[in-house]
Amino acid sequence: MSHTFYNSLDLTCKSPFGAVKAGQPVTFNLTVPEDLGYVDPHLVLTKDREDPVHYRMEFTGQTPKVNHFALTVTPTTSGLYFYHFDLYTDFRRIYRTPGGEGVLSWTDGQDWQLAVYEPDFKTPDWLKNGTMYQIFPDRFCEGKPNKAMPFADRIYRADKTGEPYFWPTEQSEGYLNMDYYGGDFAGIQQKLPYLRDLCVTCIYLNPIFEAHANHRYNTADYLKADPLLGTNEEFSALCAAAAKEGIRIILDGVFSHTGSDSRYFNREGRYGPGGAYRDRSSPYRSWYDFDSGYPCGYRSWWGFETLPEVQEESPSYVEFICGKGGVIDTWLNLGASGFRLDVADELPDDFIEKIRAAVKSHGEDKLLLGEVWEDATTKEAFGRRRTYLRGHGLDAVMNYPFRSATLDYLHGADVTAVADALMLICEHYPAPALNCAMNFLSTHDTERAITAIAGEPCNGHDRYWQSKRCIPSGLMDAAIRRLLLGYAMIFTLPGVPCVYYGDEIAMQGYRDPFNRAFFDWNSTEQRLRGPIKTLAALRRSCDAFDGGRLEIVRAEGDILHYRRVGVVQTAEIILNRGPHLIAEEAFGKNTEVNPGGFTVLVEDNHPEHVGYFSVY
């Protein structure tokens, strides 16, 4: 194989960069070495699961030792397309290699991807240069202390620094998630000044609906706030108070399953004689799939019998979630600014589209975010390619691929592979979705950031092992410095950074429930908050971080150097994970970067520019 001159990341080869709107012309420029002789290159463009279409490229000229060819194609419908080049005359083709570069091959290789999205796809502008903050409601702040438990099977935890219960560890039914620390709406409202000071502009709340586990992913009543958190009216007051601080709130929408202990299913009988499990004539019966072929007699989420799956195509369920006076309508009317859809890739595309319509009926500024762990443009689930990131479904997704790339960089992985992983998502995602993607280092579903970065690898160890591990105090300085590198990445890459509550004070913890401890309000750890505030403020003031194009300048050894190019300003970000001071050229000048540190430089895009920088 030999290399040829095409790179999808280079605007002189493909313009515009990345995904395009339906009806938007795309120009391809191919440069072929003269020593290949006569060639007749064609672009081979294939819409997903359709037959390929061959487009002959036009010879546009010759420079020493190379021939130039060009073609402009206008995809008219949204969808997922793949392409490569065929030289025809010698039966060789040009396929993608890491970094977007083309390579000549006699055999089949990897196509480039071209995502085409709806021309009217828009996402909320208010989110794009802001900062998100995720709160697990029971574990953030107790505004009304020493609560009486609203249900007898709940355990109140007055010992706020105590470890979450995780027993029984090895029993098949697992632990019950019934210990509650008392976090509530009043506590969140009390801490709004703290969040404002951290430059937070959006709070993402894990589930708040009534449910009978501390995580509240087993919904019992979609239309009622869990009484331990407060009332619907108190939630509305929280949203109003947050708005005065310039902060919006989005909610977790868990619409693929309910709890078995709910007014809809009611297996446990808490809600009287009704419910789909106990009453065949229940209005909720059609929501569920009852069949003796299932181990528990009904379809459940990943086999957990306490989480019966709903049939999202059930008309009455769709109306309940999306209709007037339904779940979405109720909570947006109370002041929420949108939803994050739990397990979005397990929801039918047409159901997501109906949710989108319900959300956007309250204004185009309302947000619909989805939980997707992979590249959302190529995701397949249940035998079907998902279409939710083409402009008629989700606004954006949680950016797990960026998290993986960031952790890989911090753990010493090949930096060129890290750069390719970052650019691949930028190339694949529609710009409106990319600019609202949720960038994070940890969530309630992962190890805490500092544990993932500097802790002993979990490697499948049980909860007892996890409960006995923490980062030694002598290693914390290095761990925090490395964590800052991670924050530098998620705050300066395309998308919206999100801080998981407590990560800013270096709270540790492996998987659930250790990553869900109560916020330590007595912590004296302050080394992360200042840099996070600086990065968040920089995002607000520099237009390069509001949709600016990502370009990799250098990815070599321990150095990852990239720039964001905005309309008015350009930012250069240099990260150095290595143990030595480096000097890297940026904006025509040598810039020193500390060992394990980073530098951000910003200049205006005109001759009389004013530059500034921050160093850690």
Locate the predicted segments by residue.
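Carbohydrate-interacting/catalytic domains
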Residues: 1-136, 142, 148-149, 173, ...
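Aromatic/acidic polysaccharide-binding cleft in carbohydrate-active enzymes
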Residues: 138, 382-383, 387-389, 395, ...
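Substrate-binding/active-site clefts of carbohydrate-active enzymes
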Residues: 136-201, 208-334, 355-361
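Active-site-proximal helices and loops of the catalytic beta/alpha 8
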Residues: 236-248, 256-257, 262-273, 327, ...
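Hydrophobic faces of well-ordered beta-strands that scaffold small-molecule active sites
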Residues: 131-133, 203-205, 249-251, 339, ...
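Aromatic-anchored helix/helix-loop segment that forms the rim or "lid"
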Residues: 419, 423-425, 459-481, 541
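Short, solvent-exposed loop/turn segments at secondary-structure junctions
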Residues: 138-141, 209-210, 255-256, 337, ...
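Conserved, mostly hydrophobic/aromatic
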Residues: 30, 135, 195, 205, ...
